[in-house]
Amino acid sequence: MTILTFINKLRCELRDNGTLRKDVWDGDNSTLNFPASTFPILENSYTVKVGGVTKTETTDYSLDKDTGLLSFVSAPVSGSDNVEMSYKAVKFRDNDFLEIINDAIDYFMWKFWKEALDTTTFTTVKNQYEYDLSSISNILYVVNAWYKTATGSTTWQAIQGLTNWKYYPQQNKLYVNPPFSSSSLPMKIFYLAGFTKGTATSDTLDIPTKYLLPFKYYIYARFFERLGIERMNEIGAITTHPYFMASPNVLNVAEMYMRKADLAANKICPKLPPMMIKQMSEGINI
């Protein structure tokens, strides 16, 4: 499913489908900016009219969907209630959900991953000790590595059978020592890959359905965390009690869902594949 489909499901579960609003203002032939009464504003949910004529975004106006500020290129003419905007106000915009989904992928990167195999990107280089693996997308860790001992060979030889190799995750480099004595021999890398982050809500959600529950709990936690902060600002603005602590219940809900996210992840996350152990021959690592 697309990320937008997943977001719409989250909206239903979190009761954030949005509230229809309509704001009207008086044009005066000089004012360019008109603030919406409620925000943030859901993407593609708004219509702006001046004197009953629908205006075109970018050409006639711009809208900051986070702050609700409507800005015209040219000031609307004078009139009573002749400027209007119909829109849907939400707690989270689609882009907010997209950002948090990507944060969840980072949060669970060592709990949930994909196994992947690369057989075309790398070849051996004579006397080269390190191989930069940054061209492999979303790589987390190298589990095993092979190469073909001769051009045209159909047999993959495990690299650790003849030489030592080690992967350094922070540098994203594979170190081989001693290096290969020949160049241009195909290499095969078996690695763990993280889920692909979305750059637009139209992208396909890369998280498998069987692993979605802890990700949803994480998103719930972030949702209520922000809601708690909003409640603090709203209630704090109207109270001066020195011992006032705003919205503890909302923040407790956020903490509860974060705990549920961790517990669910620990229950259903896959086991890491076994890592190769160095072979010993006559007391020497090979």
Model segments located where?
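Extended beta-strand solenoid/passenger and fiber regions
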Residues: 4-72, 76-79, 89-92, 98, ...
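Internal mixed-charge
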Residues: 1-20, 73-75, 79-115, 154-286
